[in-house]
Amino acid sequence: EALDLGITRKRLRSGDLTTPFRGVRMLGPIADSALAYRPLLRHGDRFSSITAAGILGAPMPRWAESQLHVTAGAGLTAARMRGVVGHASDGHGFVEVRGLPISHPGQVFLELATLLGVEDLVAIGDHLVLEPRVAEPGRPYLSLDELARVCAAVGRRSIRRARAAQALVRVGAASRRETLMRLRLVDAGLPEPQLDYPVYAMDGTFIGWFDCAYPDARVLV
């Protein structure tokens, strides 16, 4: 059914989706936990950090699945509850994704810079700026320019790490594995590949999409 709706096989294999039953793909436990906690949110509260990234469908490390991050609304104290990592109000607003209030995607990137390494952050950034082949409402979550402007802010914890990761974010990587492959290729001294590259036969027949390509060298990955 998903394929009939235009969802690609690559998207169905993405790491942010789980398989509770054969033939069923759904968002992982982070989004489920947020939905369960939603009735407890106070006016102005928002999901932030790892939880917000999970709601956005970003590829998260396994250890993050058990943490629910909630940032308090203006004038409210940080949430205190077992299983919840409460954060004091920081004056930032929220956006709604899947009916849940979360930090703005650019803010999520900065929040994660205090917890994740550069490679993990790049994978998050690639997800945020991705333009899916099949249009999805609200995607991309932000542009490369918007992410650069967010990271140009000063005086924030781990801003150097955020900027280092932001400089490596590219449009076209649809999974964490694709991000890591690109980074490994560049680390090995190869030039940056073109991402999500369409290939056509000599007669113009479409052959398929490839994760990485070096067209001048006639190399596809």
Predicted feature residues:
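Short gly/ser-rich loop at a beta-strand->alpha-helix junction or flexible surface loop bordering the NTP-binding
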Residues: E1-R160
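Surface segments flanking catalytic/ligand-binding clefts of nucleic-acid enzymes
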Residues: H43, P132-V221
